[in-house]
């Protein structure tokens, strides 16, 4: 895993959309590097899904993000859904 990496962003997104996607990806990073509130991650994921509505694009972003960072958005969301309340930590 490398600390200096490019986020998988679509340059056609608005500044607000990019901010929402980055917020979600930052929370995924936080889940792996420390811990994050499950409800906060799920709320951010809902916002993310309004921007990235297709499953194909979501999978591509997850795959690209995991390739460059080592962190899976899918695994983070699944852990948050299983926990619902409290904090999750996916530290390696």
From Swiss-Prot:
SUPFAM superfamilies on file: BH2638-like (SSF158504)
InterPro entries cross-referenced by the UniProt entry: BH2638-like_sf, UPF0223
Pfam family, one: UPF0223
Protein name: UPF0223 protein SMU_1141c
Annotated family: Belongs to the UPF0223 family.
Gene3D superfamilies in the record: BH2638-like
Superkingdom of origin: Bacteria
């Amino acid at each position: 895993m490398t600390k200096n990496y490019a986020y998988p962003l679509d340059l056609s997104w608005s500044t607000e959309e990019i901010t929402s996607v980055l917020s979600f990806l930052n929370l995924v990073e936080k889940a792996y590097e420390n811990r994050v509130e499950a409800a906060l991650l799920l709320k951010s994921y809902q916002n993310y899904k309004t921007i990235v509505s297709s499953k194909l694009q979501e999978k591509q972003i997850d795959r690209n993000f995991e390739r460059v960072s080592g962190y899976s958005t899918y695994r983070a969301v699944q852990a948050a859904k299983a926990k619902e309340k409290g904090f999750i930590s996916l530290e390696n």
